[in-house]
Amino acid sequence: MDIKSKSLEELTDLCDTLRDKILKTVSSNGGHLSSNMGAVELSVAMHYVFDVSKDPFIFDVSHQSYAHKLLTDRWNRFDSLRQFNGISGYTKPSESKFDYFVAGHSSTSISLVVGACKAIKLKGENRLPVAVIGDGAMSAGMAYEALNELGDRKYPCVIILNDNEMSISKPIGALSKYLSQMMAGQFYQKFKARVNQFLSYVPDSAAYMAKRFEEGFRLITPGMFFEELGLEYIGPVDGHDLKELISTFTTAKLMNKPVIVHIQTIKGKGYELAEGPKEKWHGVSPFNLKNGQSVNQANQKSATNIFSELLLNLAKKYENVVGVTAAMPSGTGLNKIIEVFPDRFWDVAIAEQHAVTSMAAMAKEGFKPYIAIYSTFMQRAYDQVIHDCAIMRLPVVFCMDRAGIVGEDGETHQGAFDISFLNAIPNLNLVAPRDEESFKNIMEFSYAFDSPLAIRYPRGNFILNNEYKSQKTALAKGEILENGDGSVAFIGYGNGVGKAVQTAKKLNFKPTIVDLVFAKPLDKELLLQIAKTHNKWYVFSDSAKRGGIGEILAGFLQENLLTNILIKSFEYEDTFIKHGKTSVVEDYLSISAEKISNTF
């Protein structure tokens, strides 16, 4: 969409149209609402001032990219947002040439800017990288690693810091606002350059005094930190004032240096309900536009809610139980526990590495730490799991939510890989509940367990709802849930047990159904017992096939020279799994109970 010829009035009308389109689509499909509603004017101003056909537009996480998608080549397809084979909720180059990079995890944008700047310089091209990063993403260390290099290299670029009042403090008083307005004008930037030129000619003593005055001057402005890093700072700027945004971006574009443009926006702008509790409206399921109520009310407790209740009970029972989450208190259910025990449970912002290492120290001091984290974000703390927890065999418990297919968030968020990359770590044990009762037993076991433990559980509900009596959890002990009538064994892990049960109900024979419970260490005694009478093993797990439960069990058979047993796993093939409803995606991957049953 070409908007460069539009008047300010026409651009304002366009913002209203974009906001209406986003609101109606997200209410129907679900998605990230409040951050995108707040970034409409920002996106329009970016497309008006910069050249999206050549300038890399880089959206951190890309929770703020919906308007950008609509302004490029996806207006007519936007109704398919987050649907299978539809528009992704995140930036995705395979979807559009105007999406510079895949996004989904936080705080990568400034590093991408630095890399793009280096490439542009080496290629001798005239392009200007432009990044949008939220104040929440600025809580992660990677952003500061990139800023550190950027301030030293001085590559021309524009970093738009979208402050929607989730992390960064408000500017101080009228003086700060006045100084920021001055800094946003081209006149001030030219004046500042002339002053610096003048200082190069005056005696050292006078220059020193002038420099000291300038440093003191900056102490009362919000950009002091960035300027001390060697970056130009403009702001704060009203992120909903199109005229001011266009003027500010034009100034930044002409500066030929790294510029931080600090804008302030309102999350949920334009939808009164979403302008209220910010966290509630960040990521939403389909909802009623009139009252904001979710369309799909769950009849069964989610795995997240079960975990939250169980951990709260442990915390009430044992005073040494502590916990942490990395910017996901609501998503992991830790928010309810933080309210009750604010001195023992913490949200440490987007800092998975810090979260793990800090809890390792608490374990060393005699506390029992629980780390509530999404499976996909465990990837960000892999070194800390090995170096700071496993080597010393510290009793840290990793509670990994969103294991398996997470649905509409797609490739960057699927919890497919945790079994594969954690199984290789010595001293780390892997366990998964199949339902609420088994989860309760595992959590009770976890408190007394004296080594690192990783518990994985799905987004939403368990497939099973306590249909089978759960045994007290013991290390490396699985369970036989049903004895079959032949030589076929269905071996499930976690929510995969439910899939095994679903599949068995569709068959004309009765397989033996086994809950592995532990992926590491395995219940070798139970597996050897099954091997005596079952020469066909079918494995069910919501995880990657490479390094997954099937390969773990195949390795067990090989080690024990059980070459007569046929083994086949129903896990994810070696591919990144696209977005869409979980049931639709599983059917596409041929791992739904219906598709699996058709293979027998």
Swiss-Prot record:
SMART domains: Transket_pyr (SM00861). Thiamine diphosphate binds at residues 63, 104-106, 136-137, 164, 271, 352. Binds 1 Mg(2+) ion per subunit. Binds 1 thiamine pyrophosphate per subunit. PROSITE patterns: TRANSKETOLASE_1, TRANSKETOLASE_2. The keyword rRNA processing does not apply. It comes from the Bacteria. Its EC number is 2.2.1.7. GO terms for molecular function: 1-deoxy-D-xylulose-5-phosphate synthase activity; magnesium ion binding; thiamine pyrophosphate binding. Its cofactor is Mg(2+); thiamine diphosphate. Mg(2+) binds at residues 135, 164. Transmembrane segments: none annotated. It catalyses: D-glyceraldehyde 3-phosphate + pyruvate + H(+) = 1-deoxy-D-xylulose 5-phosphate + CO2. SUPFAM superfamilies: Thiamin diphosphate-binding fold (THDP-binding), TK C-terminal domain-like. Coiled coil: none annotated. Pathway: Metabolic intermediate biosynthesis; 1-deoxy-D-xylulose 5-phosphate biosynthesis; 1-deoxy-D-xylulose 5-phosphate from D-glyceraldehyde 3-phosphate and pyruvate: step 1/1. It is an enzyme of class 2 (transferase). Keywords: Isoprene biosynthesis, Magnesium, Metal-binding, Thiamine biosynthesis, Thiamine pyrophosphate, Transferase. InterPro entries: Dxylulose-5-P_synthase, THDP-binding, Transketo_C/PFOR_II, Transketolase-like_Pyr-bd, Transketolase_BS, Transketolase_C, Transketolase_CS. One of its GO terms (biological process) is thiamine biosynthetic process. It holds the Pfam family DXP_synthase_N. GO terms for cellular component: cytosol. NCBIfam families: dxs, PRK05444.2-2. Belongs to the transketolase family. DXPS subfamily. Homodimer. Catalyzes the acyloin condensation reaction between C atoms 2 and 3 of pyruvate and glyceraldehyde 3-phosphate to yield 1-deoxy-D-xylulose-5-phosphate (DXP). This is 1-deoxy-D-xylulose-5-phosphate synthase. It comes from Campylobacter fetus subsp. fetus (strain 82-40). The lineage of its organism: Bacteria, Pseudomonadati, Campylobacterota, Epsilonproteobacteria, Campylobacterales. The gene is dxs.
